[in-house]
């Protein structure tokens, strides 16, 4: 069920904190959605570093998107990463159950309890301690309708309340309560990164573009900085 952004009230926020996710109206008009889609289709297909794109930086700091993030993280939150996800007939993949455990940082620096490290699209990524991830928020803005037929996100409510889970723990985790997050064009899925989530290949391949923005409200330990702070 989609909830209008104006109904983002404490009672509904409490439900989000319990479940770890919510589907809401992103508050973007059709013109803004069209312009955003056209920009990404022509200039930034498959982009992993979206916050390097001026229009996406403007979107992330807009009042419309901050109206979604601030009730969860507070008024001092900021965007730290942006990714474009799309499933098409040519790129129609399955994503196994997992948590989002890595952050993008400016440079590598050895921090106790942090690791492993990797480089994706030229950017340093690291798994921090779970307290960093648990206080973050993902805002997934849908540029196309998305349902079970074209690879919609599936989630396990409440699973974000656990620490990092191993592969075997994820495989054994009860998933009877798992649900599909159907979303319409213009909807946003708000999600805690530690929430167990997955997606299946699209049964009916069609464009399923999602602008995935990650927000945080905490500075990182001395010696390491966010790649972006928008």
Task: Give the predicted meaning of each segment.
Residues 23, 188-190, 212:
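Hydrophobic beta-strand signal
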Residues 222-230:
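Charged, cofactor-coupling segments
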Residues 2-19, 28-185, 198, 202-206, ...:
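Non-heme Fe(II) oxygenase catalytic core, chiefly the N-lobe of the double-stranded beta-helix
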């Amino acid at each position: 069920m989609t909830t209008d952004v104006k109904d983002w009230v404490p009672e509904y926020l409490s439900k989000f904190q319990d479940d770890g996710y919510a589907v809401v109206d992103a508050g973007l008009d059709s013109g803004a959605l069209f312009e955003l889609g056209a920009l990404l289709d022509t200039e930034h297909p498959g982009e992993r570093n979206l916050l390097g794109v001026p229009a996406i930086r403007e979107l992330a700091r807009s009042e419309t998107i901050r109206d979604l993030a601030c009730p969860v993280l507070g008024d001092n939150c900021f965007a730290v990463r942006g990714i474009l996800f799309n499933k098409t007939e040519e790129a129609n993949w399955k994503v196994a159950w997992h948590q989002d455990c890595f952050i993008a940082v400016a440079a590598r620096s050895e921090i106790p309890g942090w690791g492993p490290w990797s480089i994706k699209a030229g950017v340093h990524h690291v798994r921090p301690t779970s307290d960093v991830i648990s206080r973050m928020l993902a805002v997934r803005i849908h540029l196309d309708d998305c349902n079970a037929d074209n690879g919609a996100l599936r989630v396990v409510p409440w699973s974000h309340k656990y620490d990092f889970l191993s592969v075997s723990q994820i495989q054994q985790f009860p998933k009877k309560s798992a649900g599909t997050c159907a979303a319409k064009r213009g909807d946003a899925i708000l999600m805690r990164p530690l929430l167990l989530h997955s997606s299946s290949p699209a049964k009916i391949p069609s464009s399923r573009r999602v602008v995935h923005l990650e927000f945080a409200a905490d500075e990182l330990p001395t010696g390491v900085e966010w790649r972006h702070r928008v």
